[in-house]
């Protein structure tokens, strides 16, 4: 059995592709890695021109819909072409629900459905660790790991 793994030339993605290739070899699946520049990689994903592809997503706001909306049938970034009317209906209902607990429950059901359907196969999650001295003020931990320096200030640095 042979698969082509589409990825960009990003060093992290190439390393993860090599690890996945080794894992597939252990179960007797031959995998070729096809690395191209990011613009070409995005284009082939939009055209669904791949067997398996590495797609990355970074949450730009703190809500589960940031990831779950990607799997809606009509989503622009639904590169795998996942389509499940039950999933879409759950997400539509969640979008219209103002009760946060109910909304969360609906999105959890949608997530479980997508996992059961293998709509995605998450390989890894990026982690950022911020080490900030106590005299730095204005630093707010957030999902994007983003703090503008114009909002930062410092108190007197303690003497050693």
Language model feature labels by segment:
Residues 1-9, 31-34, 51:
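Short, well-ordered beta-strand elements
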Residues 9-23, 41-160:
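Detector for C-terminal structural segments
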């Amino acid at each position: 059995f042979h698969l082509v793994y589409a990825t960009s030339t990003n060093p992290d993605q190439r390393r993860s592709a090599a690890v996945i290739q080794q894992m597939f070899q252990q179960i007797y699946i031959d995998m070729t890695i096809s690395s191209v520049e990011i613009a070409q990689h995005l284009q082939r994903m939009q055209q669904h021109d791949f067997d398996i592809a590495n797609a990355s997503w970074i949450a730009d706001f703190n809500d589960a819909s940031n990831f779950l909306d990607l799997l809606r049938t009509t989503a622009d970034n639904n590169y795998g072409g996942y389509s499940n009317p039950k999933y879409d209906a759950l997400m539509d209902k969640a979008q219209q629900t103002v009760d946060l607990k109910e909304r969360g429950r609906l999105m959890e059901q949608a997530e479980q459905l997508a996992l059961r359907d293998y709509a995605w196969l998450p390989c890894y999650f990026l982690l950022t660790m911020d080490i900030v001295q106590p005299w730095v003020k204005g630093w707010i931990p957030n999902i994007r790991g983003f703090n503008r320096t114009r909002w930062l200030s410092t108190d007197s640095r303690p003497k050693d």
